[in-house]
Amino acid sequence: MESELYECDVLIIGSGGAGCRAAIEVSEHKLTPIIVSKGLSFKSGCTGMAEGGYNAAFACVDPEDSPDVHFEDTMRGGGFINDPRLVRILVDEAPDRLRDLEEYGALFDRQESGLLDQRPFGGQTYRRTCYHGDRTGHEMITALKEEVIRRDIETIDEVMITSLLVEDGSVLGAMGVSIMNSEPVAFRASSTILASGGAGHIYPVTSNTMQKGGDGFAIAWKAGADLIDMEQVQFHPTGMVYPESRRGVLVTEAVRGEGGILLNSEGERFMGRYDPRGELATRDVVARAIYTEIMEGRGTENGGVYLDVSHLPDEVIEEKLETMLLQFLDVGVDIRSEPMEVAPTAHHFMGGVRIDEWGRTNLKNLFAAGEVSGGVHGANRLGGNALADTQVFGRRAGISAAKNAMSSSRRHVRSLIEEEEQRIKDMVRDGSIRPAEIRDELHEAMWSDVAIVRSRRSLESAMSRISTLMDKLGDLDVPETGGFNSNLLEALELENMLITASLVTRSALIREESRGSHYREDFPETRPEWKRSILLNRKMEPQFIGR
C-alpha cells in the first residue's frame, strides 16, 4: 500500500521538551512544523518523567553562583570532554529559557521573598537547581504542551520513524510505520529535527519510557550522521529495586538534594568512603559506589542499598518529595518512617549525534537537540542540566531549521519512500526466532558486559554477541497479521537497539581509560591523552576530537 504522505516546512521527530521547544520556535518564524511521536504526544518522552529540576545560575539562594561557575561545574562533571562551546551556550542561555517556560505557564517553587528557590544537586558548587516539587519535568511538559496547542501546531501520534530519507547527503524527510495499523507513513520536509531522546531500553533495567530504544541514534547513523561519546551512558544511582515490576523506576536526585542519606545493609552511611561530597557527588561516582557495596556483599536482600529520609520533617517530605512519597506508598513503603531500597538504573545517554552551536549535524537539512544529540554533557551529566539542555538547544535547533527551510525547497522523495516501503514489507516473513528472544539476549549482554563496570574481555564478548544477534535478524518470525502487528514493530525496534548497542560497545572498547560514566576495570585511571571525544561515522571508523 502506498504511504500516507505529510508535507511541512520542518519535521520534528519527538514530542518531549526539546521537540516541543523546537516546534514553538519554528512557529515563531511563521513556518509550518509537524511533531511526530512514537507514542502519545507529550507523554511518551522522558521530559515529563524528570523529577528533580532545571539548572540555571540565577544566584537566588547562593549569590556567589554565576554562569561561569555553572560552566566550570559542568565541564568538571563531564570529565572535560564536553564541547566547551555548547556548555557555554547552555549556562548562558538557561536562565532566559526558564523565563520562557514561565511565560508558557510553568510554575517553579519560590522563596518567601518571591525569588526562585534553588536546591543542591550533585556536582554543584552552589545551589542552582530550580524546581517544582519533585515533578519539575511534568510541570514543564504541561506548559510546553499548552503552548504547542495554543499555536495550533500539528502533532501526529503513534508513528515509529524507521528511516530518514537521504539523497546525496541531504535529508529530505523521514519514513515511518503507524503503530496502530502497521501502514507506512512518509514525511517530506525542508528541514528535519531529531529530538527522539535516548536508548535506556537497550538495558533491562532503566528509568526510561518504553519507547526509548535508540531509534534516533540508529536512523541518524544509518543516514550517515556522525555520533560522538557513545560510550558514555549514565546509570542513575537510585532506581527502585522492589517489587520487580517497578525495578528501574527513577528515584529522583532531589531526595538526596533535600538531605536523603545512603546506607548499606550494615547500617553504614558509606558514601564518605568514596567521595568527600558524600551523597551529592556526581552520579557516576555514586552509581559506582552503590554497585561496589552490592557486589561486595553489603547490599539489601533485594539487591540494592537503602536511601533514607526518615530523619527529615514530615512536611518537607510531603511538600518537596510528594511524588516519591506516593510512589513508595503505592508499594507499601512509607518513606516518612522507612528507608527506600535503590540501585543504579540506565538513565541518560551523554553521547549522540554530533551537533554544532545551532543544532546542525554533518548532514544537510538535519538538526538534533536534547538527549539524542551529543557534546553538551561529556562523560557525565549533572542532574538538572538535561531539562535546561532541552530548552536551550531545542530553541536553537528550531531557529536553525527554520532559517534552513526558508532557503530550501522540498525535493521529490517518491523513490526513497518506495525503497523503505519495500524494506519494511520484506521484514514480514516466516522465521524461527521470536523478536523477544533476541531482545532478551541483548539485554543480558548489555547488563553483564557493557554497564557500570567494563573491561576488554567483557566488551569483546558483547561485540561478538551483538554481531551474532544481528545475523539472526534475517530469521525473525514476523507473520502478516493485518492491522496492528506487534512482531513487525518489535523487529524494527530490535534493529535499532542492536545498532545503538554496537555503537556504545565499539566506542567503549576504543576508550582505554576510565572517565565519567565509562569505567574500565582494566584501565581504572583517567589518562590525560584521552581528554578527547570519540566520533564514529557510518563505517564505525573512529576519529578523535581533542578537548
UniProtKB/Swiss-Prot annotation:
This protein's record includes keyword Oxidoreductase: yes
Listed cofactors: an oxidized flavin
Catalyzed reactions: coenzyme B + coenzyme M + fumarate = coenzyme M-coenzyme B heterodisulfide + succinate
One record GO biological process: fumarate metabolic process
Manner of cofactor binding, per the entry note: Binds 1 flavin covalently per subunit.
E.C. designation(s): 1.3.4.1
Any one GO molecular-function label of the UniProt entry: oxidoreductase activity, acting on the CH-CH group of donors
pH influence on activity: Optimum pH is7.0.
Activity as a function of temperature: Optimum temperature is 75 degrees Celsius.
Swiss-Prot/TrEMBL keywords: Cytoplasm, Flavoprotein, Oxidoreductase
Subcellular localization(s) per the UniProt record: Cytoplasm
GO cellular component: cytoplasm
EC top class, as a word: oxidoreductase
Family: Belongs to the FAD-dependent oxidoreductase 2 family.
PANTHER family: SUCCINATE DEHYDROGENASE 2 FLAVOPROTEIN SUBUNIT (PTHR11632), SUCCINATE DEHYDROGENASE [UBIQUINONE] FLAVOPROTEIN SUBUNIT, MITOCHONDRIAL (PTHR11632:SF51)
Assembly mode: Subunit A of the heterodimeric fumarate reductase of methanogenic Archaea, composed of subunits A (TfrA) and B (TfrB).
Function of the protein: Catalyzes the reduction of fumarate with reduced coenzyme M (CoM-S-H) and coenzyme B (CoB-S-H). In vitro, is able to reduces fumarate with reduced benzyl viologen, oxidize CoM-S-H and CoB-S-H to CoM-S-S-CoB with methylene blue, and reduce CoM-S-S-CoB with reduced benzyl viologen. The enzyme has specificity for the two thiol compounds as the CoB--CoM heterodisulfide reductase. The enzyme is very sensitive to oxygen.
Entry protein name: Fumarate reductase (CoM/CoB) subunit A
Organism for this UniProt entry: Methanothermobacter marburgensis (strain ATCC BAA-927 / DSM 2133 / JCM 14651 / NBRC 100331 / OCM 82 / Marburg) (Methanobacterium thermoautotrophicum)
Lineage of the species this protein comes from: Archaea, Methanobacteriati, Methanobacteriota, Methanomada group, Methanobacteria
